Amino acid sequence: MSKRITIEELQSYLWNSAVLLRTNIDAGAYKQYIFPLLFFKRICDVYDEETAKAVEEYGDDASEFDEDEIHTFIVPKGYHWNDVRAVSENVGVAIVEAFRKVENANSDKLQGIFGDGAWTNKNRLPDRLLKDLLEHFSTKTLSIANCPEDELGQGYEYLIKKFADDSGHTAQEFYTNRTVVHLMTEMLNPESGESIYDPTCGSAGMLISAIAYLKEQGKEWRNVAVYGQEINALTSAIGKMNLFLHGVKDLSLIHISEPTRPL
């Protein structure tokens, strides 16, 4: 049974996950841990939702389909959110293993997306703290029915801004004031079928704004080629997650990379 999550509930849920880290992690590093866990939770909840829909529609025949015919992202057996949640010792190791397995199972889309946070450093992230984080995120089901893409994307953007506000001078590498971004988007006036390129895309705010602009205009946005370039690997991963959470899934249209020269 679905239970819609309001924007207010979502924002509180997301920010309270960061509050759990405050005594152990510097504010500038929140994004290394909260964003990957949020994305992993979303992937697994949507995976379960897609499985249930396939069984409802096809019954026993659902097992005849290849996983990629049913699922947006594949979650390998034994590496689902619930499997990680069940671990009581060496939780950081279990998280890293699940991240790598999911990345490898979706290598054309997700390679490197979970970053390289120090999950196994028990001085910074003891098992107790990681268990608390997992239990906190487990209090809500982040299915599409409960939290549509645009709304979860809005929550993600809220968290990006909160992290930027908390981390001060370190924020400029991944966050641009959204008022400026929206003004630039209106000046750009993107159209359906065009290519949109941001050479310093950060967390992909400009690219997301361009897609949102087309949606608000009632124009087709799925045929827009979106390109971004970002030299910082962590920020690039945040940008990829941002695009995915906003419903931009076709990675043949998305190129967030870290080259030293323009695309």
Name what the model sees in each region.
Residues 170-257, 261:
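Conserved S-adenosyl-L-methionine
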Residues 1-192, 251-253, 257:
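Non-catalytic, mostly N-terminal accessory regions of nucleic-acid modification and defense proteins
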